[in-house]
Regions:
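Thr-Gly-centered strand-to-loop micro-motif
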Residues: 4, 40-42, 64-65, 92, ...
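A short acidic, often aromatic-flanked loop/helix-cap motif at beta-alpha or helix-coil junctions
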Residues: 8-11, 47, 68-71, 152-157
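Short secondary-structure boundary/capping segments
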Residues: 6-8, 29-31, 52-53, 79-80, ...
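Membrane-anchoring hydrophobic helices of lipid-metabolizing enzymes
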Residues: 1-14
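Catalytic core of membrane glycerolipid acyltransferases/transacylases, capturing the structured
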Residues: 11-68
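A generic local structural motif
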Residues: 1-4, 24-26, 75-77, 132-134
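Generic preference for hydrophobic
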Residues: 3, 16, 39, 146-148
Length: 182
């Protein structure tokens, strides 16, 4: 695992916005950033007792992707964590992309940062989908690159800038993936 760009993590709470390639992205975000941070994760993870316990200890919030009302409540809880001084990790694609093209970045995932007025830190993950391929129970050796990109301030952002932010972040991470892959 090669992680670069830790110097781009500002002091204070931020929202880390990362692409989501594979099952190991959550442990990677917990171990490769400046410190373990709460994550926004799908509610299905709560069914795995060992993982649920430590995620609850980290103040992670669980999102029901099929319930828009609960999803809004989840993002409100994440925004509260930001107000308490925690940083939050989110995967705005909402699902794994298995190393393929990035999916759409959901605006709601970014909205908590703009409402809290905290910076957004884009994080590019490449190679994590190779550690455990979809449908496999085996862990495989793989080269994983994580690049922490410069933060984007959300303080005082105009409405049109806020609307453009999800696509801007998606494009930044996609461009970084292209650079990593040469």
């Amino acid at each position: 695992i090669t992680t670069t760009g830790k110097e781009n993590i500002p002091q204070g709470p931020v929202v880390f916005v990362a692409n989501h390639q594979g099952y190991f992205d959550i442990p990677l975000m917990l171990t490769q950033l400046d410190k373990p941070n709460p994550l926004v994760a799908k509610k299905e993870i709560q069914k795995i007792p060992m993982i649920r316990g430590w995620m609850e200890q980290l103040h992670c919030v669980f999102l029901d992707r099929d319930d828009p009302r609960q999803s809004m409540e989840c993002l409100r809880q994440a925004q509260e964590l930001l107000g308490q001084g925690y940083s939050v990790v989110i995967f705005p694609e909402g699902t794994r992309n298995s190393g393929g093209p990035l999916g759409e970045f959901k605006a709601g995932a970014i909205r908590m940062a703009t409402r809290a007025g905290v910076p957004v830190v884009p994080v590019c993950i490449d190679g994590s989908h190779l550690l455990m391929k979809k449908g496999s129970l085996w862990i495989h050796p793989a080269k994983v690159n994580i690049r922490i990109l410069p933060p984007i301030s959300t303080e005082g952002m105009a409405r049109d800038e806020i609307r453009a932010l999800p696509e801007q972040l998606r494009q930044q991470i996609s461009d970084e993936l292209d650079r990593l892959r040469g």
